[in-house]
């Protein structure tokens, strides 16, 4: 474990500091062997407890409520509730039982729409196929539908089999696609950044009425400036896992403009999820497995007064 290694490294630094400038109390120096044994067991029990908590964090995702106000009107719709799940990584670790838990958690939020923001599967599709997990995802309930985009893991291993399986889940697969779930706003699902031939956002937005709210799903959070330049109102991302295991969250801050959470660049707002699943071992330290519930408020439409005069727009709070 990285944490046992770090603990031993700290102990070695303490030992070296003692050699350079003695500072241990007399009772410790007089019982050094017993002290080393005690420290060893403290490390083992401490790391074991940490890993139990880290496993529990993965197995019990939290519900993260995010409140966002968009500056455009969406027809007669004043609000929209979206459940966002990214980075399920269905495979050897994330199996049928956990996916059923995710679905139940999503349905309990009573969302208008559900989005699965990439990396639905880990490497091989056979784990999802053999367990018929598509039947579980079909149980997701949302009146405006379920929408799915590719992540980088959808391009690993048997890509065509993954595509066929995703088509069976009951959701709408958006690969460089634009839809209007209920005609009041646009939802754009981008192909993953790893695919060098994916369409530009500018080309996807040809014919889009920028007077309506525009929400973009893009697995990897690299395109903040592009979204801002093209008039996108809200970008939803995953991919980073927020580092998953400490101290990697610290490194993520050096790599990404925003590796986790809410962010705003110009008029465009973003949310980067740490993901509901995991990649690799089933542990999280210093991060969370999350199901994101986006509570979106739209600008109120112009209303006509009794004598036909237009009233001032009202900003929804």
Where are these regions (language model features)?
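Non-catalytic terminal accessory segments
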Residues: 1-59, 301-317
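Soluble catalytic domains of enzymes that build or remodel membrane lipids, polysaccharides, and related
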Residues: 64, 69-303
């Amino acid at each position: 474990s990285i944490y046992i290694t770090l603990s031993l490294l700290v102990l070695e630094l303490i030992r070296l500091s003692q050699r350079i400038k003695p500072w241990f109390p007399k009772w410790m120096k007089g019982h050094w062997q017993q002290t080393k044994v005690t420290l060893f067991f403290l490390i083992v029990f401490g790391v074991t407890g940490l890993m139990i908590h880290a496993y529990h964090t993965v197995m019990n995702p939290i519900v993260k409520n995010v409140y966002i106000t968009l500056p455009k009107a969406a027809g007669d719709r004043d609000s929209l509730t979206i459940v966002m799940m990214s980075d399920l990584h269905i495979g050897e670790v994330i199996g049928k039982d956990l996916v059923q838990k995710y679905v139940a958690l999503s349905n309990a939020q009573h969302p208008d729409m559900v989005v699965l923001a990439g990396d639905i599967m880990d490497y091989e599709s056979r784990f999802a196929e053999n367990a018929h997990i598509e039947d579980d995802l079909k149980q997701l309930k949302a009146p405006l539908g379920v929408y799915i985009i590719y992540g980088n893991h959808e391009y690993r291993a048997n890509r065509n089999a993954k595509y066929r399986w995703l088509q069976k889940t009951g959701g709408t697969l958006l690969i460089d696609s634009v839809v209007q779930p209920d005609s009041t706003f646009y939802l754009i699902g981008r192909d993953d950044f790893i695919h060098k031939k994916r369409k530009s956002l500018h080309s996807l937005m040809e014919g889009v009425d920028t007077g309506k709210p525009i929400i973009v799903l893009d697995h990897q959070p690299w395109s903040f400036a592009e979204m801002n330049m093209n008039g996108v109102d809200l970008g939803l991302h995953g991919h980073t896992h927020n580092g998953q295991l400490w101290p990697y969250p610290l490194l993520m801050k050096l790599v990404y403009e925003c590796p986790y959470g809410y962010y705003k660049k110009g008029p465009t707002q973003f949310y980067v999820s740490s993901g509901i699943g995991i990649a690799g071992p089933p542990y999280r330290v210093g991060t969370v497995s999350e199901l994101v519930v986006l509570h979106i408020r739209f600008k109120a439409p112009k209303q006509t007064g009794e004598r036909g005069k237009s009233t001032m727009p009202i900003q929804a709070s």
